Amino acid sequence: WIMGHMVNAIEQVDEFLNLGANAIELDIDFDKDGIAQITHHGIPCDCGRECTKKAIFTEYLDNIRQVTTPDNPKFREQLVLLALDLKLQRISSAKAYRAGEDVAKKLLDHYWQRGNSRARAYILLNIPLVEDCEFIRAFKDTLKNEGYESYNDKVGINFTGNEDLDKIRDVLEILGIHKQVWQADGITSCFARGTERLKEALEKRDTPGYNYINKVYAWTLVRKSIMRRSLRLGVDGVMSNNPDRVIKVLKEKEFADKFRLATYNDNPWEKFRG
């Protein structure tokens, strides 16, 4: 999975897909009451990027629904995963439950259209910290209460704050989540980061019977040398400001026979058995 980073303006969707991304990350900004308002990262952000691009969240969902719906004029077959980077750290943790309800309802109304949409992308909920876990509970409660629990099959969980992996496992256990879990490891492209935690996540992913990590990705990679390092370790995905660079690295002799781009036929919730 090549995840285009910080794709917050509607016009950026095609831009990043044209560069080779098959997944996109969008930042969800909330008001003080936990209502999802806009797709927006804000300052500071990655080096060399414009931090202020934005869109109304519901309008973004209306557009991306078309982009991921077969036979729609806007359909782009390659886009199979949407990572919602939830800016919960900007609101009180007491509002995390309200935020989860709101995002679930907006997805139901504007993306899935309560069963009337054929939009097919998988959804990854990127949670900043384990203290925000009530968002997950609320999201799942809302799907159940609204009568659409079946959409849980399309939704995965990912904690992005580089916290202790055993701490994350404990929270997932409390929430009763034993599948459809991704694990991110990374830092803004402005800084260097070692591989100790990334290696630990990959080791846990590959441990038989360990159900709390199905996929691992590294972020935000812009240098080809770091992309190569991550691929050698065996990551499932790379988040980048430059998907075209990832494409070029994947075509190199060292990687061409080991990796390929994920398609809709690849289940993002299953561990890869190479």
Swiss-Prot record:
Keyword Metal-binding assigned: yes
E.C. no: 4.6.1.-
Q: Which InterPro entries match?
A: PLC-like_Pdiesterase_TIM-brl
Which tissues does it occur in?
Expressed by the venom gland.
**Cysteine disulfide links:** C45-C51, C47-C190
Main location (coarse class): secreted
Quote the catalytic residue positions. Answer: H5, H41 (nucleophile)
A single GO BP term for this record reads:
lipid catabolic process
- Please tell me one Gene Ontology term that the record gives under cellular component: extracellular region
Q: What is this protein called?
A: Dermonecrotic toxin SdSicTox-betaIIB1bi
Q: Which organism is it from?
A: Sicarius cf. damarensis (strain GJB-2008)
